Design a protein with these regions (language model features):
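Short alpha-helical hairpin
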Residues: 1-15
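N-terminal core-binding DNA-recognition domain of tyrosine recombinases/integrases
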Residues: 13-116
Length: 116
């Protein structure tokens, strides 16, 4: 797995800082896949997306979940990963957490949760 992320989707400096949190390449690959998918569907780099892009992505993924193409848990995982990356970017920009600017977080509150 490449250490670098596609420059068309994310700032590679930020990605390199973020990926240091991962304990495995599998985790890194999962985050890359979900971020790429979101960016491809939005047609924008991650840092240029807004609440409308997140809403469209949610609606698209929810339709896939309702059709049985992905599970509710998978949808939750995708949003948890996207939320994590968005939150990280906000922390880097402001020096503190700024969850009010994370467009993914509000969707997580109503998503399927994994069983303990």
């Amino acid at each position: 797995m490449s250490q670098n992320f596609d420059t068309e989707f994310v700032n590679t400096k930020m990605w390199d800082l973020f990926r240091k949190r991962f304990k495995s390449r599998t985790t890194e690959a999962s985050y890359q896949s979900d971020i790429r998918e979101f960016c491809r569907l939005s047609g924008k780099p991650f840092e240029e997306t807004d609440s409308r892009d997140v809403k469209r992505y949610y609606e698209t993924m929810k339709k896939r979940a309702d059709a049985g193409e992905i599970s509710g848990i998978t949808l939750t995982k995708k949003f948890r990963e996207l939320h994590s990356f968005a939150s990280f970017l906000m922390e880097q920009e402001s020096g503190e957490e700024a969850p009010g600017h994370d467009y993914f977080y509000p969707y997580l509150r109503n998503m399927v949760k994994e069983s303990p």
